[in-house]
Amino acid sequence: MEERMNVLHDFGIQSTRYLQVNYEDSQDWFVLVSVIADLRNAFYVLFPIWFHIQETVGINLLWVAVVGDWFNLVFKWILFGQRPYWWVLDTDYYSNSSVPLIKQFPVTCETGPGSPSGHAMGTAGVYYVMVTSTLAIFRGKKKSTYGFRCLNVVLWLGYWAVQLNVCLSRIYLAAHFPHQVVAGVLSGIAVAETFSHIRGIYNASLQRYCLITFFLFGFALGFYLLLKGLGVDLLWTLEKAKRWCERPEWVHLDTTPFASLFKNLGTLLGLGLALNSSMYRKSCKGELRKSLPFRLACIVASLGLLHLFDSLKPPSQIESIFYILSFCKSATVPFASVSLIPYCLARLLGQTHKKSL
């Protein structure tokens, strides 16, 4: 089994080497693609846009992103996937030959296990929601037309073009092996397709959100403690990253599995708090919600405020404090987009309307 994995990993290393040598001029493009494909953009950019265009799509998108990334964490703990940037330097597979020269980049040195790819899985799931939702909006109750069929082809071609670029980006940056990005894409689509059949997420109570958040945290923590009790070190990848990353400053605490877990759980709980708040009911359930200028104002204000939130980085000197602050910061993202900003704008527009009378 180990020999087969070594052959598979060697194929991945050769693929990375080929891309880095033959597409050296595309370095900036691949780095940009990897940055854009980060799941953070689904929370800070795509969610507020889609929520204020059509609430159900935004809610579905956030659930797919959060639960998909949670499954990604569990899969990584089970599969113990290597990453190219440390495997090529750590393995004895090349003991009788020269070690392939693999470049590293500022976004290469992620600290979690490599399989499946979180970038590929997140992008596949989130963009699947956007494509299928867009097609559902344009399809409506009408029969399929030539224009709709063209839109269908264009959107799916665009979808697979995005997935291809994300996969090539992760391989180029030596962050993942080819089989890991393929597994990520398939897993992301599976999660998104599953949630397309779950209707309970659109009217879930705050109690249900709390229970699900607690379950996801409890399961992950219990699974971690169980494997640790069996002698399995689930933080083995952090040592690999610190040892083999070209520059220490490229190793970031926010790429650890627990950092991802706390950010996702905070986001989910924040959505539950927002959707069940009085501010949301007062601002998003009235006639004002149907106004296009109001929705556009909510989108612009949300993107601006969330950009400020994103620039605030919790101190990472103490891990426990970092995780708690990451949880709280993530919870404010959907809460601000869904309830706080619409409520403030509704009050402001209401007062302006009264003065005009």
UniProtKB/Swiss-Prot annotation:
SMART domains for the chain: acidPPc
UniProt binding sites for substrate: 83, 170
Record keywords: Endoplasmic reticulum, Gluconeogenesis, Glycoprotein, Hydrolase, Membrane, Transmembrane, Transmembrane helix
UniProt-listed InterPro entries: Glucose-6-phosphatase (IPR016275), P_Acid_Pase_2/haloperoxi_sf (IPR036938), P_Acid_Pase_2/haloperoxidase (IPR000326)
A GO MF term: phosphate ion binding
Main location per the UniProt record: endoplasmic reticulum
Glycosylation sites: 96
Highest taxon of the lineage: Eukaryota
EC number: 3.1.3.9
Catalyzed reaction equations: D-glucose 6-phosphate + H2O = D-glucose + phosphate
Localization (cell): Endoplasmic reticulum membrane
Keyword field contains Transmembrane helix: yes
SUPFAM superfamilies: Acid phosphatase/Vanadium-dependent haloperoxidase (SSF48317)
Described function: Hydrolyzes glucose-6-phosphate to glucose in the endoplasmic reticulum. Forms with the glucose-6-phosphate transporter (SLC37A4/G6PT) the complex responsible for glucose production in the terminal step of glycogenolysis and gluconeogenesis. Hence, it is the key enzyme in homeostatic regulation of blood glucose levels.
Protein name: Glucose-6-phosphatase catalytic subunit 1
Organism this protein belongs to: Rattus norvegicus
